[in-house]
A protein has these predicted regions:
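Conserved active-site-proximal phosphate/metal-binding subdomains
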Residues: 1-27, 219, 238-261, 272, ...
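Alpha/beta enzyme core
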Residues: 109-110, 138-139, 151-267, 274-297, ...
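N-terminal functional module of multi-domain proteins
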Residues: 44-130
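An N-cap/entry alpha-helix motif that binds or orients negatively charged groups
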Residues: 2-80
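Structural signal for hydrophobic packing residues in well-ordered secondary-structure cores
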Residues: 49-59, 112, 116, 164-167, ...
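Long, hydrophobic, well-ordered secondary-structure blocks that form the structural core
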Residues: 118, 129-155
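Flexible, glycine/proline-enriched loop segments at strand-loop-helix junctions
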Residues: 95, 121-122, 144-151, 183-189
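Active-site mouth loops of central-metabolism enzymes
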Residues: 88-100, 145-154, 207-215, 272
Length: 340
């Protein structure tokens, strides 16, 4: 199976919102929520996609002809590509009831681990979602990253116990999920965290902690102050705040602000090809997350669909590196791309 076949297979399985488009650019689903769309006028996911396409790569084939190494080492683990499957929750609501969160995470975590990368898993109001996700990660020898919502502190403590039992090599919190309605309405309240609160949570985690949802230099410096091991430059695919800038627009300034800090920087939002991955690394990211296309991969081909999508992205990255005269991720520098 290739990814094109996977898309075709996914269409009958997905609900009425996601169209399993050949190019997942946010246009067909736009402001559909429930569904995979963006909040408000619905242009943030589209902007994410478009801004990567406005960056061009600089070809240079006067270079040593040697094998390309696409591997990334993060927190002591080495991965085949600098690509991670992003966390997705409530798949029945947004993508159709052929799969539930438990089954989705189980397929995704296992397939990603078998094909050399790792998956971030989603969270939800149903406690069984995190229970099953961390079990899948444990079965994959810790090769997964549970993503905990910014619940109240007692709920976070319960989730962290599951994380510890899973042996996950890192844990994340999508701090920007504070913009999701179901979190706002909880009692006791969930949502935004202060630097002090985040510091306490990071100490509780006791494992490399990734803060997802950073879109400003100020936010990045707060995550650094709290003790984060990594951040993810992300606007939650436009699903939590209307009319955000694209992640590609803010990435470089955040990279410069954290220079020399040792904090790893990942980025998501509209990255849809191995060439886009190359662009993100050229702007200073250590790795990327891709979310929505992995949903199509799982719905359209289960584990084989995930394998097909990873192969597609990896092959494209390798080809771009070769044609730009670089043989390792460290050699991908700012002069490898052109911005306008």
């Amino acid at each position: 199976m290739n990814y094109t076949e996977c898309i075709e297979n996914a269409r009958p399985c997905l609900g009425k919102y996601c169209k399993a488009c050949p190019e997942c650019n946010g246009r067909a689903c736009k402001n559909q929520m429930p569904g995979p769309g963006s909040k408000g006028i619905g242009d943030t996911a589209i902007r994410n996609y478009d801004k990567w396409k406005q960056i061009r790569v600089n070809m240079d084939t006067i270079a040593e002809n040697k094998p390309v190494d696409t591997s990334l080492t993060l927190f002591g683990r080495t991965f085949k590509y600098p690509v991670f499957a992003g966390p997705v929750g409530a798949v029945q609501l947004h993508y159709g009831d052929c799969l539930d969160d438990v089954t989705y995470n189980d397929i995704l975590v296992s397939a990603c681990a078998k094909n050399g990368i790792a998956a971030f898993t989603g969270d939800g109001t149903d406690p069984n979602v995190m229970v099953a996700a961390t079990k899948a990660i444990k079965n994959a020898d810790g090769a997964g990253i549970p993503t905990v919502k910014p619940w109240n502190i007692e709920t976070i403590r319960e989730k962290m116990e599951l994380v510890h039992e899973s042996g996950a090599f890192a844990v994340a919190m999508d701090i920007d999920a504070a913009g999701l309605p179901f979190l706002k309405n909880l009692e006791p309240p969930a949502g935004s965290k202060t630097v002090s609160e985040l510091c306490d949570i990071i100490q509780m985690a006791g494992t490399p902690f990734i803060v997802k949802g950073i879109m400003t230099v100020k936010g990045a410096l707060k995550a650094k102050e709290a003790g984060a091991s990594a951040i993810i430059v992300s606007n939650h695919g436009g699903r939590v705040l209307d009319q955000c800038p694209a992640t590609a627009e803010v990435l470089e300034s955040i990279v410069k602000a954290l220079e020399g800090s040792g904090i790893k920087i990942l980025v998501d939002g509209g990255i849809r090809s191995g060439t886009d991955v190359f662009k993100a690394l050229a702007l200073g990211a250590d790795g990327v997350l891709i979310a929505r296309p992995f949903v199509t991969a799982v719905y359209g081909g289960k584990a084989d669909g995930v394998r097909a999508y990873i192969d597609k992205i990896g092959t494209e990255l390798e080809d771009t590196m070769k044609m730009c005269g670089v043989s390792s991720l460290d050699e991908i520098t700012r002069d490898c791309v052109m911005t306008f």
